């Protein structure tokens, strides 16, 4: 059964200038200490930060690494070398699409990620549970996270209902 499951061993976001950790989640025991995690992140950063053509997929120490670079961060998703690289890249893109949807198409950057850390982590948790990829549809994920502001039409309708209710209560009180 496990051959039908897509899994992730780790997910992290690094500062693109220094390779410092912004966010990291590890899902297996290969990197059970902070020292091992940071050493792996450094190796990944050293390999991927030198790529000038914007590569999105690489192999490192029996791990498949997919990543996307932005203005001041790099977002990484790591699976074992037997995972489907297209599936991992699709899930990474779904994570990014969800964030762009939730943050109203704002440019993804370190400040946005840190200012919206709760939403960023909740989005990640909706996609990955214990290392198993549970969802990859960005619209479904954004709906589950549910932080979008209401549309103006919905807000107007809510205000109109409240005003009508107050009028009715006032009218009944004055009778």
Curated annotation (Swiss-Prot):
Belongs to the adaptor complexes small subunit family. Oligomeric complex that consists of at least the alpha, beta, beta', gamma, delta, epsilon and zeta subunits. This is Probable coatomer subunit zeta-A. The coatomer is a cytosolic protein complex that binds to dilysine motifs and reversibly associates with Golgi non-clathrin-coated vesicles, which further mediate biosynthetic protein transport from the ER, via the Golgi up to the trans Golgi network. Coatomer complex is required for budding from Golgi membranes, and is essential for the retrograde Golgi-to-ER transport of dilysine-tagged proteins. The zeta subunit may be involved in regulating the coat assembly and, hence, the rate of biosynthetic protein transport due to its association-dissociation properties with the coatomer complex. It comes from the Eukaryota. Its main location: cytoplasm. It holds the Pfam family Clat_adaptor_s. Transmembrane segments: none annotated. The keyword Transport applies. It is found in: Cytoplasm; Golgi apparatus membrane; Cytoplasmic vesicle, COPI-coated vesicle membrane. The keyword Cytoplasm applies. SUPFAM superfamilies: SNARE-like (SSF64356). GO terms for cellular component: COPI vesicle coat; Golgi membrane. Gene3D superfamilies: 3.30.450.60. It comes from Dictyostelium discoideum (Social amoeba). GO terms for biological process: intra-Golgi vesicle-mediated transport; intracellular protein transport; retrograde vesicle-mediated transport, Golgi to endoplasmic reticulum. It is a peripheral membrane protein. PANTHER family: COATOMER SUBUNIT ZETA-A-RELATED, ZETA-COAT PROTEIN. Keywords: Cytoplasm, Cytoplasmic vesicle, ER-Golgi transport, Golgi apparatus, Membrane, Protein transport, Transport. InterPro entries: AP_mu_sigma_su, Coatomer_zeta, Longin-like_dom_sf.
């Amino acid at each position: 059964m496990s051959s039908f499951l897509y899994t992730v061993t780790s997910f992290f976001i690094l500062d693109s200038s220094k390779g410092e950790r912004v966010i990291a989640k590890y899902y297996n025991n290969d990197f059970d200490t902070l020292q091992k995690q940071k050493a792996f992140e450094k190796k990944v950063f050293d390999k991927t930060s030198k790529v000038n053509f914007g590569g999105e997929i690489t192999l490192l120490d029996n791990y498949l690494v997919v990543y996307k670079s932005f203005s001041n961060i790099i977002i990484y998703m790591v699976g074992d070398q037997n995972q489907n690289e297209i599936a991992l890249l699709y899930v990474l893109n779904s994570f990014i699409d969800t964030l762009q949807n939730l943050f109203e198409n704002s440019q993804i950057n370190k400040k946005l990620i840190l200012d919206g850390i709760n939403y960023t982590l909740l989005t990640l948790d909706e996609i990955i549970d214990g290392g198993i990829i549970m969802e990859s549809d960005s619209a479904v994920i954004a709906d589950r996270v549910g932080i979008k502001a209401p549309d103006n039409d919905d807000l107007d309708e809510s205000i109109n209902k409240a005003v009508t209710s107050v009028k009715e209560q006032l009218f009944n009180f004055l009778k």
